[in-house]
Amino acid sequence: MGKITFYEDRGFQGRCYECSSDCPNLQPYFSRCNSIRVDSGCWMLYERPNYQGHQYFLRRGDYPDYQQWLGFSDSIRSCRLIPQHSGTFRMRIYERDDFRGQMSEITDDCLSLQDRFHLNEIHSLNVLDGCWVLYEMPSYRGRQYLLRPGEYRRYLDWGAMNAKVGSLRRVMDFY
């Protein structure tokens, strides 16, 4: 079970809304989001309703302003609680669409795909175990995308506008 609290103003001030499960539309509860407290669980936040737009991965902790979660604005319109996974993590990445081209298997965090696999683009992937966050740039920076178990035949399937990938991280709650 997870718990996240959204605040309209910075520094955990103003109107707030507490959430403990997936919510496809947060608009009825607050007009803007400038700070967040994650009491438990790992969450993916989305700038638009129905899990659309920029995504932001948050784990337990305090985020006193939207720059702390690498947000582009104070717009958070939907959220998803990421289920905890206690087993192994496994993903296969491919250099071309539809699982074609060279395949590499990943079982742990990857700070730089370029350094480790000599890749800066992934065109398809298959998440076999666990949930992952894909980052557009190395060192877990840039746009973020939640990858749940399943097949992603092209980068559009995970919500990206291009195949650029810099790093990958397993979703784990370390607290």
UniProtKB/Swiss-Prot annotation:
Residues 2-40, 41-83, 89-129, 130-172 form the Beta/gamma crystallin 'Greek key' domain. Keywords: Eye lens protein, Repeat. InterPro entries: Beta/Gamma-Crystallin, Beta/gamma_crystallin, G_crystallin-like. Transmembrane segments: none annotated. PROSITE patterns: CRYSTALLIN_BETA_GAMMA. Belongs to the beta/gamma-crystallin family. Crystallins are the dominant structural components of the vertebrate eye lens. Monomer. This is Gamma-crystallin B. It comes from Canis lupus familiaris (Dog). The gene is CRYGB.
